[in-house]
């Protein structure tokens, strides 16, 4: 067994990206051992949320001071302090989970729209989007499926609860949901695109149509306008 990774010395707000980096070293089903911050630094429930976002199941089993983290197939969150906007997909596709970049399948128009809107300046580079532009990325549900219609409504409800805790902890001012299904399933079945009256924790909520190429009713200029509006707050 390799030596555990000691995550106690990093700042609490840097923990999501540290866990994401650790996640990228493991294949699904593999385990990693980490020495995690004490409960008075990061609450256990929040720590479980952050582990889930990074693609780890947080196990109770400990080896000395280390906790075993088991990797599952998903796309790790790209989140951290100072975000101005959190972009939230429905859930990862197998391609996104395996390639490590969301919205990157051929025909998906998220990145072309994000570039055209001035939201990001590098194509398919979520790390740069976070560090250079304050744009984070996550998903409502972290379970990977081939189609979003394979998800259950309860998964959206549980996923939004995780997001509430995260956006309040990181003080995210606004969240943009790419795809309407998650918000409709968990909060407002009649919700349309645009800014919502209801917030997600303390964050304002913007809904926009799916950027998938299967969504023929939304053109690239329309998607660009939605992202520009979400970024403008």
Language model features with spans:
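An N-terminal amphipathic alpha-helical segment
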Residues: 1-33
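Short, surface-exposed acidic-centric catalytic microdomains
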Residues: 4, 99-154
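Short, conserved loop/helix-junction motifs that constitute active-site signature segments
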Residues: 25, 167-170, 198-201
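Short, hydrophobic/glycine-enriched beta-strand segments
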Residues: 79-90
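Short, well-ordered beta-to-alpha junction loops that form the rim of enzyme active sites
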Residues: 37-39, 90, 177-182
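C-terminal capping/extension of enzyme domains
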Residues: 43-45, 50-81, 106, 113, ...
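Internal catalytic-core helix/loop-beta-alpha segment
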Residues: 134-189
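Short N-terminal binding/cap micro-motifs at the start of the first secondary-structure element
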Residues: 94-98
